[in-house]
Curated annotation (Swiss-Prot):
Gene3D superfamilies: GroES chaperonin (2.30.33.40). Keywords: Chaperone, Cytoplasm. InterPro entries: Chaperonin_GroES, Chaperonin_GroES_sf, Chaprnonin_Cpn10_CS, GroES-like_sf. Belongs to the GroES chaperonin family. The keyword Electron transport does not apply. Together with the chaperonin GroEL, plays an essential role in assisting protein folding. The GroEL-GroES system forms a nano-cage that allows encapsulation of the non-native substrate proteins and provides a physical environment optimized to promote and accelerate protein folding. GroES binds to the apical surface of the GroEL ring, thereby capping the opening of the GroEL channel. It is found in: Cytoplasm. It comes from the Bacteria. Signal peptide: none annotated. This is Co-chaperonin GroES. It comes from Enterococcus faecalis (strain ATCC 700802 / V583).
Length: 94
């Protein structure tokens, strides 16, 4: 399993829509990049200059929204993930 370092979070990104609400099939260039996904793994948190560790605000299983062009896409054991910094996560979805 992927184990992120520091304040990084591993996210399994939600699938993008293949069709519009009206049923029109979208070309791959016309699709919006998904901005939501499920947290798969979290790092231990950011360490401040004084040595204090800032705890992570998200946990495994959370559904989160993140900034559109953030993170690094990786493929691990045939599954695509996004690794982002905690600061790029903008909300949790309940």
């Amino acid at each position: 399993m992927l184990k992120p370092l520091g304040d990084r979070v591993v996210i399994r990104v939600a699938k993008e829509e293949e069709k519009t609400v009206g049923g029109i099939v979208l070309a791959s260039v016309a699709k919006e990049k998904p901005q939501t996904g499920e947290v798969i793994a979290v790092g231990e948190g950011r360490v401040l200059e004084n040595g204090t560790k800032v705890p992570m605000e998200v946990k495994i299983g959370d559904t989160v929204m993140f900034e559109k062009y953030s993170g690094t896409e990786v493929k691990y054991e045939g599954v695509e993930y996004l690794i982002v910094s905690a600061k790029d996560i903008i909300a949790t979805v309940e």
